[in-house]
Amino acid sequence: LKFFPKLGLFIYIFIYLIFPKLAITQNTNVDIRKNLENALNTRNLKLIDNFFIEEESSKVQEKFKKIIKDFPNSKWQIKRLSGVKSKEKIFNIKVNGNRIVNGEKFFLESNFKYLFFTQNDKINNGNIKNLLTTIRNDKNKIDIIFRIPEKVLTGTTYDIDIILNEPLGNLIIAGGIISHQDESYLKQNINIEPLASGGIFKTTRASSKPATQIWSGLITHPEGTISFTKSVEIVEKL
């Protein structure tokens, strides 16, 4: 349990990506994907600063510095995907890194889609979709599956299943999960309880209005600890 406060900080680092106010901007006359990926991986803060509109630059710089501080060796991979709409562009972004905390080595993996439009040679209206971030110290010994939908209809019920595939036998595991749609999660604690069923299984209802719902949780196991964050887009039609 002594690792939970630090893990909570790691979860926070990536939750901020959900909010569209942190839209990335850059001149579209150059290869945005390649230059952005290079700037992130070389920690070129001055170059990264040039990618953002003036009013957002300081906020983005602050957030990026937090990631660098907690995962100094993090690596970013950006792939270009086709947009669903003619003017919409999509990047598929993956972030990997590791960090030793209190003698334990934690591995970060984050995957998400970044959707945006271009206007006046700038990328704007950026949104993070289908985010899944895990931080774990089990060396991937725990066979775990996250069955959480990418998007659901407003007002409908949907299932959240975090499944441990291997039989538990006499093993004792514990875990918990919370949901939030804004920074109210900073005031919430994740209650850790025994998981006799071999995972976390929950049925919930989507909000009545379009939104992005975020689920964050922890699972503790004799092999290690896994923290996770997953976004669910709530839409009026699929």
Located regions from the model:
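Short, low-complexity N-terminal intrinsically disordered segments enriched in polar/charged residues
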Residues: 2-5, 9-41
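Short solvent-exposed beta->alpha transition segments
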Residues: 45-100, 105
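Surface-exposed, short loops/turns at beta-strand junctions within beta-sandwich domains
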Residues: 205-212
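Short beta-strand edge/turn micro-motifs at domain boundaries
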Residues: 106-143
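Short acidic/polar inter-strand loop motif in beta-rich domains
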Residues: 220-229
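Short beta-strand segments of immunoglobulin-like
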Residues: 147-153
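Short edge beta-strand/loop segments characteristic of extracellular beta-sandwich folds
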Residues: 158-167
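Aromatic sugar-binding surface patches on proteins
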Residues: 194-202
